[in-house]
């Protein structure tokens, strides 16, 4: 993918949070949105990450030097894609409804721990999803038992989660 209009949204978010916006940089990483796409196999994911190291180091040097990131060109394609995704797709389709565990769930709670929105709570040894999901796929792709699924869209699919 590309950054689309992420700069526009990041700039608004920074202003809302009282932070200075210094730009953004798109860095290709392995796909993990397995509700719609296919994640790469482990070997391909490693290669994608290997290729990402140089742009990450460049971003770090810009940050370390307190320099702005280069301005990202906003194309009509970016406007259409990002506009459609953020204005139509997100409100209509991005929901926690449909997340569930299979009998393979070991009740470890890792899904709840990985959720950046704290949208998953454990009731006994079972995860329960709230309503604040952004579909980051961390709960699905980070599950050690591969027991978290989203509707029927993720069954049997390769999972990718970058461990820290």
What are these regions (language model features)?
Residues 21-24, 99, 127:
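Generic structural signal for residues in well-ordered beta-strands
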Residues 31-34, 69, 88-90, 110, ...:
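Aromatic-enriched hydrophobic runs in primary sequence
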Residues 101, 110-128, 134, 138-155:
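Iron-sulfur cluster-binding cysteine motifs and their immediate structural context
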Residues 75-107, 113:
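A mid-sequence, solvent-exposed acidic-amphipathic segment
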Residues 1-88:
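FMN-binding flavodoxin-like domain, especially the glycine-rich phosphate-binding loop
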Residues 160-163:
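Active-site-proximal loop/hinge segments that shape catalytic or ion-binding/gating pockets
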Residues 5-6, 97, 107, 135:
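Residue-level preference for nonpolar/small residues embedded in alpha-helices
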């Amino acid at each position: 993918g590309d950054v689309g209009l992420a700069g526009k949204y990041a700039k608004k978010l920074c202003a809302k949070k009282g932070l200075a916006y210094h730009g953004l940089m798109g860095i290709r990483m392995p796909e993990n949105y397995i509700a719609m796409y296919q994640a790469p196999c482990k070997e391909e994911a490693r290669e994608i990450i290997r290729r990402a190291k140089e742009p990450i180091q460049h971003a770090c040097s810009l940050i370390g030097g307190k320099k702005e990131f280069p301005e990202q060109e906003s194309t009509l394609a970016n406007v259409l894609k990002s506009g459609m995704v953020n204005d139509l797709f997100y409100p209509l389709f991005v929901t926690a409804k449909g997340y569930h565990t299979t009998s393979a769930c070991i009740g470890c709670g890792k899904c709840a721990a990985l959720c950046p929105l704290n949208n998953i709570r454990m009731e006994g040894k079972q995860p329960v999803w709230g309503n604040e999901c952004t579909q980051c796929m961390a709960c699905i792709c980070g599950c050690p038992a591969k027991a978290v699924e989203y509707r029927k869209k993720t069954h049997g699919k390769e999972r990718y989660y970058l461990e820290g």
